């Protein structure tokens, strides 16, 4: 067996298929682009859907890739098995209507067994085939596979619902008897069974049927090949590792974690090993996901990241790691993967910052979960129950990241159990929902043959002219290719067009189609790219049109000019934000409309208004400097040497377009722009807000729209000035400050009066000392307007040393509040935190605190008297 690193194995696979005429597709972002059916890119073929569905025609029908992927449907198994991962790499080769079974099988065999490539022992390889797929069986035998190494398996048919489907062939590597975990006569002890000896390394799907909506299967007009080889599994074979984790993809992370732990070592303890594996796996997924623009949040991709971070932190605690540590693993991931993913190491400072921020928040999450758990326990006791329902335990786990083990421990302290069977049932329901969703989604789509074979060229000339004469070459109406239309909606292609097709955040051009006599025959409502890249115009037809005829195409120049100004301003804003906030700020999305622009960017925390003003001022400064705006088309490497900024989430062709505004900004862009920044006139930010964890959104206007916005605000200021009875706008701020000072003084007077009233009322309570067992107790309810006043009363009680224990309650804004204080000489016997936990269920709430002072909040103010009684009863039971 050759000794190869993971980087060498990945490159060898890609080089092999490159030698077979394949184009190497770069690994796409984990965040799917234009595919709402996927939360994450979860396989190599997921990035090829646009080719297999006919939405886009690839330049080369032979493709290969090493695609980073994320799956979280079996997250509970990560760390417990040899090969479950959240993040993994899928090596694959693909044929879009080109070669088929014979070539795919022959090349697979060559890669695996040739001494020039993997060089594996042929006797260690086994293949499974679909029983009816005699072509695949014959192809394997033709390359020299022994018949007893080819196994027919009924499940070898790839089908995920409507769309391409077909038989598949799986390849297994025999790791030897030393890896066998089953008895010789076990029915699963065979290649394809559930065992550790025969390791599946490759699956080749022969996509030859279309699964129709009516459940039938029809032969595809173009047969495809889709394969997937898990890099981590292959590396474990080359490096003779018992599991995927003992390879160079994971061990540096495990070793770093061990160094951060309380003297723990991988391999010394099975339970600790699970934690080491979980942390290593999750650190990889977290790093790559954040690097691709996803951020921790409460839903969707953000929730997945948050859940992985929480799970890793809990496992770090099991290893004795105190405080934040995951951020220290981010650069380790970058170093491991830098050969193929250099951007991860380049972004490691930013990624680590995001991770550290989320780690620091984890304590808040635990607190929220604890409050919910206290409420559940209080409700149970009130109803006479003694078991937390499985659904509630699952909610704590799934929504708050509350480990079920912690729920069980905490509930046990209160004499409550957890319905483990119910919890596991809810877990299974979640898995079933995920599995059903995968089965039902139309992941590959039906092949669209209407435009896929239309290769009539259509030249875009809109960079230099906004009107042209052109021939109508393709016409679609009613989902059919037609040669003429008279009215209604239609799609059209022209041999030349000045209309921009929506792309890169810029909306499509609008305008009219005129006949040779100058009469309008159609309005252009939208423009999108067809499968072969042509501009496809959506028309509202008002007069007859026919293919082959010549028409005048005229772009709405007023709308187009507004879009140009907003698009160039977007690039100026992007650069200005990086100047003000730092290079960690990245574009997270944009929309360039005619009447406004929208720009999303990564930034943690609130945006300081002063910094936002700096960015706005910088954009306007560059507008007033009258910078020339130039564009150039060049190859991607030359563009990068020019310093052009590219988005990691975008894919670029061999030739790219670069836009520059003086020396201030140079970025990849295929959109329309002004010739000089002075054409923008004015730039004004109209709003800034958060749209997700770590993502901020700016909306802005330019030119006449910016003037109109400022004019409207002037009118508002004038109206406010009139209400405040000031004659000059610049006097408004001074007047408002004076009013605020007056309000603050009144509030202070009110607080002083309320404090005096509370003290008077508390005086009556403080005068009434009772005996509860061995302790002197003062308890009762008072009227206050906020919790701070309760704490102030506790301070008064402590200063006067009025009793051993104080318990006060109050209703504030419809909620119940409790405070418990214990004198210094009694804190060894009685702790305020213990007492508050005992009585807070009476108000349907929970709380905690220090031995000398604790507080709680709840939803049931009517329970405050019961809480006072419970406090006395609890104290009476203490020694």
Curated annotation (Swiss-Prot):
SMART domains: tRNA_SAD (SM00863)
Cofactor note as given: Binds 1 zinc ion per subunit.
Domain of life where this protein originates: Bacteria
Keywords per UniProt: Aminoacyl-tRNA synthetase, ATP-binding, Cytoplasm, Ligase, Metal-binding, Nucleotide-binding, Protein biosynthesis, RNA-binding, tRNA-binding, Zinc
Subcellular localization, as worded in the UniProt entry: Cytoplasm
Enzyme Commission designation: 6.1.1.7
Binding site for Zn(2+): 567, 571, 669, 673
Family matches, as InterPro entries: aa-tRNA-synth_II/BPL/LPL, Ala-tRNA-lgiase_IIc, Ala-tRNA-ligase_IIc_anticod-bd, Ala-tRNA-synth_IIc_core, Ala-tRNA-synth_IIc_N, Ala-tRNA_ligase, Ala_tRNA_ligase_euk/bac, DHHA1_dom
Functional description taken from the UniProt entry: Catalyzes the attachment of alanine to tRNA(Ala) in a two-step reaction: alanine is first activated by ATP to form Ala-AMP and then transferred to the acceptor end of tRNA(Ala). Also edits incorrectly charged Ser-tRNA(Ala) and Gly-tRNA(Ala) via its editing domain.
Record-stated family: Belongs to the class-II aminoacyl-tRNA synthetase family.
Listed name of the protein: Alanine--tRNA ligase
Origin species: Levilactobacillus brevis (strain ATCC 367 / BCRC 12310 / CIP 105137 / JCM 1170 / LMG 11437 / NCIMB 947 / NCTC 947)
């Amino acid at each position: 067996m050759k000794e190869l690193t993971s980087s060498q194995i990945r490159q060898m696979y890609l080089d092999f298929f490159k030698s077979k005429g394949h184009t190497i597709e770069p690994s796409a972002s984990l965040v799917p682009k234009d595919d709402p059916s996927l939360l994450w890119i979860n396989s190599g073929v997921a990035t090829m859907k646009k080719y297999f569905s006919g939405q886009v025609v690839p330049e080369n029908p032979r493709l290969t890739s090493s695609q980073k992927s994320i799956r979280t449907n079996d997250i509970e198994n990560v760390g417990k098995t040899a090969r479950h991962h959240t993040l993994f790499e899928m090596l694959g080769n693909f044929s879009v209507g080109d070669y088929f079974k014979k070539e795919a099988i022959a090349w697979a065999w060559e890669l695996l067994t040739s001494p020039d490539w993997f060089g594996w022992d042929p006797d260690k390889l086994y293949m499974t085939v679909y029983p009816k797929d005699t072509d695949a069986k014959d192809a394997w035998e033709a390359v020299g596979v022994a018949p007893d190494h080819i196994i027919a398996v009924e499940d070898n048919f790839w089908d995920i619902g409507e769309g391409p489907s077909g038989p598949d062939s799986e390849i297994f590597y025999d790791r030897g008897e030393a890896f066998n975990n089953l008895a010789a006569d076990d029915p699963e002890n065979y290649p394809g069974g559930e065992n550790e000896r025969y390791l599946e390394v490759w699956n080749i799907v022969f996509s030859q049927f279309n699964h129709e909506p009516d459940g039938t299967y029809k032969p595809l007009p173009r047969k495809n090949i889709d394969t997937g080889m898990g890099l981590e599994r292959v590396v474990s074979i080359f490096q003779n590792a018992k599991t995927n984790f003992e390879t160079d993809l994971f061990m540096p992370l495990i070793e770093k974690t061990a160094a951060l732990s309380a003297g723990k070592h991988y391999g010394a303890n099975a339970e600790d090993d699970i934690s080491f594996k979980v942390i290593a796996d999750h650190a990889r997924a977290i790093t790559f996901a954040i690097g691709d623009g996803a951020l921790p949040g409460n839903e969707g991709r953000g929730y997945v990241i948050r859940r992985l971070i929480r799970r890793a932190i809990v496992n770090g605690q099991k290893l004795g790691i105190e405080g934040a540590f995951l951020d220290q693993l981010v650069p380790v991931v970058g170093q491991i993967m830098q050969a193929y993913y250099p951007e991860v190491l380049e972004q490691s400072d930013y990624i680590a910052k995001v991770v550290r921020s989320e780690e620091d928040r984890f304590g808040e999450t635990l607190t929220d979960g604890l409050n919910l758990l206290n409420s559940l326990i209080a409700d149970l006791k009130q109803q006479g129950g003694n078991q937390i329902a499985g659904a509630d335990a699952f909610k704590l786990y799934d929504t708050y990241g509350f480990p079920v083990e912690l729920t069980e421990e905490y509930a046990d302290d209160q004499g409550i159990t957890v319905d483990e069977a119910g919890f596991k049932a809810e877990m299974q329901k979640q898995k079933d929902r995920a599995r059903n969703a995968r089965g039902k989604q139309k992941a590959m789509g039906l092949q669209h043959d209407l435009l896929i074979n239309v290769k009539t060229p259509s030249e875009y000339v809109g960079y230099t002219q906004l009107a042209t004469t052109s021939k109508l070459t393709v016409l679609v109406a009613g989902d059919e290719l037609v040669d003429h239309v008279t009215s209604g909606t239609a799609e059209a292609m022209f041999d030349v067009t000045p209309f921009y097709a929506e792309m890169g955040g810029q909306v499509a051009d609008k305008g009219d189609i005129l006949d040779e006599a100058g009469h309008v025959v159609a309005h252009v409502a939208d423009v999108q790219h067809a499968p072969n890249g042509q501009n496809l115009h959506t028309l509202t037809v008002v007069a007859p049109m026919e293919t082959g005829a010549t028409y005048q195409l005229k772009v709405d120049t007023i709308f187009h000019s507004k879009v140009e100004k907003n698009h160039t301003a977007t690039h100026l804003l992007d650069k200005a934000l990086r100047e003000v906030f730092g290079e960690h700020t990245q574009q997270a999305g944009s929309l360039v409309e005619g009447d406004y622009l929208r720009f999303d960017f990564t930034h943690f925390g609130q945006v300081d208004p002063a910094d936002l003003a700096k960015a706005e001022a910088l954009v306007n400064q560059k507008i007033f400097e009258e910078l020339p705006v130039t564009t150039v088309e060049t190859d991607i490497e030359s563009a990068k040497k020019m310093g052009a900024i590219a988005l990691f989430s975008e894919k670029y062709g061999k030739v790219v377009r670069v836009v520059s505004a003086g020396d201030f900004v140079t970025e990849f862009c295929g959109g329309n722009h002004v010739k000089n920044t002075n054409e923008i006139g004015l730039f004004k930010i109209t709003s800034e807000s958060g749209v997700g964890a770590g993502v901020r959104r700016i909306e802005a206007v330019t030119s006449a729209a910016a003037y109109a916005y400022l004019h409207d605000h002037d009118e508002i200021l004038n109206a406010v000035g009139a209400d405040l009875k000031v004659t000059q706008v610049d006097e408004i701020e001074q007047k408002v400050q004076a009013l605020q000072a007056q309000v603050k003084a009144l509030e202070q007077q009110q607080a002083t009066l309320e404090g005096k009233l509370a003290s008077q009322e508390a005086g009556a309570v403080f005068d009434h000392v009772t005996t509860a067992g061995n302790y002197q107790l003062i308890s009762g309810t008072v009227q206050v307007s906020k919790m701070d006043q309760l704490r102030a009363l506790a301070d008064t009680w402590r200063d006067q040393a009025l009793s051993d224990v104080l318990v006060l309650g109050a209703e504030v804004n419809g909620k119940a509040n409790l405070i418990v204080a214990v004198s210094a000489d009694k804190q060894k016997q009685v702790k305020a935190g213990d007492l508050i936990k005992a009585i807070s269920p009476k108000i349907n709430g929970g709380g905690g605190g220090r031995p000398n002072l604790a507080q709680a909040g709840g939803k049931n103010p009517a329970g405050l008297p019961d809480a006072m009684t419970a406090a006395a009863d609890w104290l009476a039971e203490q020694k």
